[in-house]
């Protein structure tokens, strides 16, 4: 079996986790108490969904997941909520005091007290696996736990499970709306620390998803539940090929192989289609080519940046539902003829396709319409460098005045870590710039250095 362990860190990670596991349970017909009426082979775990759920002798299905937060309130909602019986109590780990939006608290002072406990729980889950494939880590860049504790955990996971893949789903600080003043600090510190430990990081920013909810679903004031359910659909699409048998299946390492041309350039952009409300879906056909085209519109991306300003290095299209390869090939051919989409000249083909016959499931009473087919596009484009540039700029404005730095230093960090992290991100921006150059231009610049 190729199992995956999900780790949900901090408030954002836990709440996205709730949306994801709610959706997985609906997709597999697992009840909130973990029973699965359709599963006839009790206790033997040879079905595809066993990559995400382990089975007990009594036929209960338990998510292979750990929830971690340094303060209890958010995880307490899981402990008392609808799915309280789904999780093993040991899988829900909470500390006593908050990381207070402070990377240093999450990474040094408070994080280090709880990290061994978390690794112990992860070890127990890993021991139940026959062939652990890797980890999916859900967190935000802006919070203290999400940034600080995640980077600590990633470092330790690299030590304990060296070769296993680690994929991140990270909530990137939105350009306009912000939940904390120090988000740029936390984001840049965590990106620097996890850059070498993460194999692939899918970023979503709240503002982009707000806009999608407002525009496509006509929700005037989207709540976090609305946002997370949409993120849940995306995560479900990415992991569907791990949980169902399909025509063209994709496993964790395959994402990396096809999306990451260089180890540091591992931040694909995520787009999902169709995001549509039930009233509208009733009147629309949504063919394969329509939903494929929708993916290439900047308005449907999960991070605010404009791929028309950048070049695509690789592109992964994950279809689910009533889709046949013939339609997909036609849709891709049509896109290639449109000259609006530019690929780097050293990667001419650049499309990987996954098809899964399990149609998308939606949460009953939710905002999304039930559709016959959906597509999730993961594209590695140089345009995402815009997102880093924005963040770096905000970091510079604050750091020039050393604003808020004393909170971090007071928790045992050194000021040098800030400048080191900032230099690393400057290098990352440069890497993106160089990757986007045509191979002939790149050779010229290399020649000038010597």
UniProtKB/Swiss-Prot annotation:
<comment type="subunit">
    <text>Dimer of alpha and beta chains. A typical microtubule is a hollow water-filled tube with an outer diameter of 25 nm and an inner diameter of 15 nM. Alpha-beta heterodimers associate head-to-tail to form protofilaments running lengthwise along the microtubule wall with the beta-tubulin subunit facing the microtubule plus end conferring a structural polarity. Microtubules usually have 13 protofilaments but different protofilament numbers can be found in some organisms and specialized cells.</text>
</comment>
<keyword id="KW-0547">Nucleotide-binding</keyword>
<feature type="active site">
    <location>
        <position position="254"/>
    </location>
</feature>
<dbReference type="GO" id="GO:0016787">
    <property type="term" value="F:hydrolase activity"/>
</dbReference>
<feature type="binding site">
    <location>
        <position position="71"/>
    </location>
    <ligand>
        <name>Mg(2+)</name>
    </ligand>
</feature>
<dbReference type="GO" id="GO:0005737">
    <property type="term" value="C:cytoplasm"/>
</dbReference>
<dbReference type="GO" id="GO:0046872">
    <property type="term" value="F:metal ion binding"/>
</dbReference>
<dbReference type="InterPro" id="IPR037103">
    <property type="entry name" value="Tubulin/FtsZ-like_C"/>
</dbReference>
<feature type="binding site">
    <location>
        <position position="145"/>
    </location>
    <ligand>
        <name>GTP</name>
    </ligand>
</feature>
<feature type="binding site">
    <location>
        <position position="228"/>
    </location>
    <ligand>
        <name>GTP</name>
    </ligand>
</feature>
<dbReference type="Pfam" id="PF03953">
    <property type="entry name" value="Tubulin_C"/>
</dbReference>
<dbReference type="GO" id="GO:0005200">
    <property type="term" value="F:structural constituent of cytoskeleton"/>
</dbReference>
<dbReference type="InterPro" id="IPR036525">
    <property type="entry name" value="Tubulin/FtsZ_GTPase_sf"/>
</dbReference>
<dbReference type="GO" id="GO:0007017">
    <property type="term" value="P:microtubule-based process"/>
</dbReference>
<dbReference type="GO" id="GO:0005525">
    <property type="term" value="F:GTP binding"/>
</dbReference>
<dbReference type="InterPro" id="IPR023123">
    <property type="entry name" value="Tubulin_C"/>
</dbReference>
<dbReference type="GO" id="GO:0005874">
    <property type="term" value="C:microtubule"/>
</dbReference>
<feature type="modified residue" description="N6-acetyllysine">
    <location>
        <position position="40"/>
    </location>
</feature>
<feature type="binding site">
    <location>
        <position position="206"/>
    </location>
    <ligand>
        <name>GTP</name>
    </ligand>
</feature>
<keyword id="KW-0342">GTP-binding</keyword>
<keyword id="KW-0493">Microtubule</keyword>
<keyword id="KW-0020">Allergen</keyword>
<feature type="binding site">
    <location>
        <position position="11"/>
    </location>
    <ligand>
        <name>GTP</name>
    </ligand>
</feature>
<keyword id="KW-0963">Cytoplasm</keyword>
<dbReference type="Pfam" id="PF00091">
    <property type="entry name" value="Tubulin"/>
</dbReference>
<feature type="binding site">
    <location>
        <position position="140"/>
    </location>
    <ligand>
        <name>GTP</name>
    </ligand>
</feature>
<dbReference type="InterPro" id="IPR008280">
    <property type="entry name" value="Tub_FtsZ_C"/>
</dbReference>
<dbReference type="InterPro" id="IPR018316">
    <property type="entry name" value="Tubulin/FtsZ_2-layer-sand-dom"/>
</dbReference>
<keyword id="KW-0378">Hydrolase</keyword>
<feature type="binding site">
    <location>
        <position position="71"/>
    </location>
    <ligand>
        <name>GTP</name>
    </ligand>
</feature>
<feature type="binding site">
    <location>
        <position position="179"/>
    </location>
    <ligand>
        <name>GTP</name>
    </ligand>
</feature>
<keyword id="KW-0460">Magnesium</keyword>
<feature type="binding site">
    <location>
        <position position="144"/>
    </location>
    <ligand>
        <name>GTP</name>
    </ligand>
</feature>
<keyword id="KW-0206">Cytoskeleton</keyword>
<keyword id="KW-0479">Metal-binding</keyword>
<protein>
    <recommendedName>
        <fullName>Tubulin alpha chain</fullName>
        <ecNumber>3.6.5.-</ecNumber>
    </recommendedName>
</protein>
<comment type="similarity">
    <text>Belongs to the tubulin family.</text>
</comment>
<dbReference type="InterPro" id="IPR002452">
    <property type="entry name" value="Alpha_tubulin"/>
</dbReference>
<dbReference type="InterPro" id="IPR000217">
    <property type="entry name" value="Tubulin"/>
</dbReference>
<dbReference type="InterPro" id="IPR003008">
    <property type="entry name" value="Tubulin_FtsZ_GTPase"/>
</dbReference>
<dbReference type="InterPro" id="IPR017975">
    <property type="entry name" value="Tubulin_CS"/>
</dbReference>
<comment type="function">
    <text>Tubulin is the major constituent of microtubules, a cylinder consisting of laterally associated linear protofilaments composed of alpha- and beta-tubulin heterodimers. Microtubules grow by the addition of GTP-tubulin dimers to the microtubule end, where a stabilizing cap forms. Below the cap, tubulin dimers are in GDP-bound state, owing to GTPase activity of alpha-tubulin.</text>
</comment>
């Amino acid at each position: 079996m190729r199992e995956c362990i999900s780790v949900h860190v901090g408030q954002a990670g836990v709440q996205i986790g709730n949306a994801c596991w709610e959706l997985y349970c609906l997709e597999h017909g697992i009840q909130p108490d973990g029973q699965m009426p359709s599963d006839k082979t009790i206790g033997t775990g040879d079905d595809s969904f066993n990559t995400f759920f382990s089975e007990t002798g009594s036929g209960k299905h338990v998510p292979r997941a750990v929830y971690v937060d340094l303060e209890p309130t958010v995880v307490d909602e899981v402990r008392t909520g609808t799915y309280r019986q789904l999780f093993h109590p040991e899988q829900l780990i909470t500390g006593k005091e908050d990381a207070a939006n402070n990377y240093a608290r999450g990474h040094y002072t408070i994080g280090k007290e709880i990290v061994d406990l978390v690794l112990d729980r992860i070890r127990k889950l890993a021991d139940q696996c026959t062939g652990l494939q890797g980890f999916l880590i859900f967190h935000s860049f802006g919070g203290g736990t999400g940034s600080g504790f995640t980077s600590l955990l990633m470092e330790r996971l690299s030590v304990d499970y060296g070769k296993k893949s680690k994929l991140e789903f990270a909530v990137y600080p939105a350009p306009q709306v912000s939940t904390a003043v120090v988000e740029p600090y936390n984001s840049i510190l965590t990106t620097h620390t996890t850059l070498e430990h993460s194999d692939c990081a899918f970023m979503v920013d709240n503002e982009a998803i707000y806009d999608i909810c407002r525009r496509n679903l006509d929700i005037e004031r989207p709540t976090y539940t609305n946002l997370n359910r949409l993120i849940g659909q995306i995560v479900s699409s990415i992991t569907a090929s791990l949980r169902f048998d399909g025509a063209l299946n994709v496993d964790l390492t395959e994402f990396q192989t096809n999306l990451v041309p260089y180890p540091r350039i591992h931040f694909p952009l995520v787009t999902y289609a169709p995001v549509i409300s039930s009233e509208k879906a009733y009147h629309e056909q949504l063919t394969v080519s329509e939903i494929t085209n929708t993916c290439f519109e900047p308005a449907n991306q999960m991070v605010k940046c404009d791929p028309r300003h950048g070049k695509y290095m690789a592109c992964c299209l994950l279809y689910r539902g009533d889709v046949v390869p013939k339609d997909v090939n036609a849709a891709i051919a049509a896109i290639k003829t449109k000259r609006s989409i530019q690929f780097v000249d050293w990667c001419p083909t650049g499309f990987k396709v996954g098809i899964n016959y399990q149609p998308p499931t939606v949460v009953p009473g939710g905002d999304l319409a039930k559709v016959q087919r959906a597509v999730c596009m993961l594209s590695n484009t140089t345009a995402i460098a815009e997102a880093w540039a924005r963040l770096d700029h905000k970091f510079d404005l604050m750091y020039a005045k050393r604003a808020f730095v004393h909170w971090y230093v007071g928790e045992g960090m050194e000021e040098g870590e800030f400048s080191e992290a900032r230099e690393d991100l400057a290098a990352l921006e440069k890497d993106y710039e160089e990757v986007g150059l045509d191979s002939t231009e790149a050779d010229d610049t290399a020649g000038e250095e010597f």
